[in-house]
Design a protein with these regions (language model features):
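Alpha/beta-hydrolase superfamily serine-hydrolase fold, recognizing
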Residues: 1-48, 65-351
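Alpha-helix boundary/N-cap detector
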Residues: 48-55
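A detector of tandem-repeat and repeat-rich interaction/domain scaffolds
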Residues: 53, 64-65
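Predominantly extracellular/secreted and cell-surface proteins with exposed
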Residues: 60-61
Length: 351
C-alpha cells in the first residue's frame, strides 16, 4: 500500500502537507528497484529522464531559500575554492558568519544527499547555514564530490573521493581560521543524512591521522550509516521506509561503491565501526527524527559510542521525517530549535 503522509498523524501537520505535495510533484508511484551495477546507475542518472528529475529537484531545493526565516542581513557570506588532497581536485566552501570582527566558534557542515546528490549551495542549505550562523557561529559548508550527480563541482566519484574532500576542507578551515575570524580550538563538525555519515567518517580519519585535537566535537543528524536496508535490528528501517526517503534498495551502496559495503568498511559505512574505531571520538550528539527509516541506526550508533566510553548524547525530534530541520520554510520553529541545540552543543563541548 502506498504511503499517504496525510494519514500519518505522527507527523507535524505542516510536514504532512509538504510531503504530500512533494509526492505529487514527483509524479511517479513506481517502486524503486535494485540496480545491477554502478555504470547502469550513472547512465540512468544522466539519461534525459534522470536529468529532468535532477533539474526538478534542484529547482525545488533552490526555491527553499528563505530570507524571512533566515535573513542575510547581519551576515557575511563568502565562497572559497580550495585544493583537495590527495587528488588535487578543486572543491568549494560556503562560509557564512555574523558580520562582526569577533572571533567565533565554527560549525564545519557537511550536506546530505546520501553522498550521492545535492549541494550546499542550494537554497535550502544556504537558509539552514544562515539559521545556524544567526546563533553566533561561523559556518563553513563543504561541497564535496558526490558519487552520482554533481554538486557545485563537476566531478562525480565513488568512495573515498567525497570523504577526502571533507577531510581536506576541514583541515583548510583549521589552517585558515584566523583569516575568517574563527577560533581554531572551537571547530565542531556537523552534518545530516549522508553528511551525518561523512561527519562521522571525517572524525575517524582525523583521529587516525593525528588531527583529532583539531576537532571540538561532533553533531550527527539522522546519520545514513548502515548501507543495507531493511534490517531486523533497526525496525524503523522497515516501518518508516517511504516517508520522504526510500532506503529499501541498493542504490546508495552501489553508487558509493558496493565493495565497501561488502567489506564492512567503517569509513564508508560507520555502522561497521568498532569500539576501537570510536574510543577516541570527541563529544558527540546524535540527533534523530521520529518518522525516519534511519532513526534506529542513529540510536544504535549513539549506544555504541557510549560503549566506547565517548561522551555522547542522543535527541529525538518528534513529529518529523528524515532531515526535517532542512525544511526551514515549512517548520522554522523546529529548524531553529535544532540550530540552537547545535550552538548549545558547541558551548558544552568547549567547557
Amino acid at each position: 500500500m502506498k504511503y499517504d503522509p496525510m494519514k500519518d498523524h505522527r507527523l507535524d501537520p505542516r510536514l504532512r502537507q509538504a510531503l504530500a505535495l512533494m509526492g505529487q510533484l514527483s509524479g511517479s508511484d513506481e517502486p524503486i528497484i535494485d540496480v545491477p551495477d554502478r555504470e547502469t546507475q550513472l547512465a540512468e542518472a544522466n539519461s534525459p529522464g534522470g536529468v529532468a528529475r535532477r533539474e526538478m529537484m534542484e529547482k525545488m531545493f533552490g526555491a527553499m531559500d528563505n530570507i524571512v526565516v533566515a535573513p542575510k542581513e547581519g551576515l557575511r557570506i563568502e565562497r572559497h575554492t580550495i585544493e583537495s588532497a590527495p587528488d588535487g581536485n578543486r572543491i568549494n566552501l560556503s562560509v557564512i558568519r555574523p558580520d562582526t570582527n569577533e572571533v567565533l566558534p565554527c560549525v564545519y557542515y557537511i550536506h546530505g544527499g546520501g553522498m550521492m546528490t545535492l549541494s550546499c549551495m542550494f537554497g535550502t542549505y544556504q537558509t539552514w547555514g544562515r539559521m545556524i550562523a544567526h546563533q553566533g557561529l561561523a559556518v563553513v559548508m563543504v561541497d564535496f564530490r558526490n558519487c552520482l550527480t554533481p554538486s557545485s563541482v563537476p566531478e562525480v566519484e565513488p568512495f573515498p573521493a567525497g570523504l577526502n574532500d571533507c577531510v581536506s576542507g576541514f583541515l583548510w578551515t583549521h589552517q585558515n581560521a584566523a583569516s575568517m575570524g574563527i577560533d581554531p580550538s572551537r571547530i565542531l563538525i556537523a552534518g545530516e543524512s549522508g553528511g551525518g555519515n561523512l561527519s562521522i567518517a571525517t572524525t575517524m580519519v582525523l583521529g587516525r591521522d593525528g588531527h583529532g585535537d583539531k576537532q571540538l566535537g561532533l553533531y550527527a543528524m539522522c546519520p545514513y550509516i548502515s548501507g543495507q536496508w531493511p534490517r531486523e535490528d533497526y525496525p524503523s528501517s522497515a516501518e518508516n521506509d517511504g516517508i520522504f526517503i526510500t532506503i529499501g534498495n541498493n542504490h546508495g551502496a552501489m553508487a558509493y561503491g558496493m565493495e565497501e559495503l561488502e567489506a564492512g568498511n567503517p569509513l564508508a559505512w560507520p555502522h561497521f565501526a568498532t569500539i576501537e574505531d570510536l574510543k577516541d571520538f570527541p563529544p558527540t550528539m546524535v540527533s534523530v527524527n521520529e518518522c525516519d527509516p534511519l532513526r534506529d541506526e542513529g540510536i544504535a550508533f549513539y549506544r555504541k559510542l557510549l560503549e566506547a566510553g565517548v561522551s555522547a548524547q542522543c535527541r529525538q525530534v518528534m513529529g518529523t521525517a528524515h532531515g526535517a530541520e532542512l525544511f526551514c520554510s515549512t517548520v522554522p520553529d523546529i529548524s531553529r530549535v535544532t540550530a540552537r541545540d547545535i550552538r548549545g552543543w558547541v558551548d558544552q563541548c568547549a567547557e
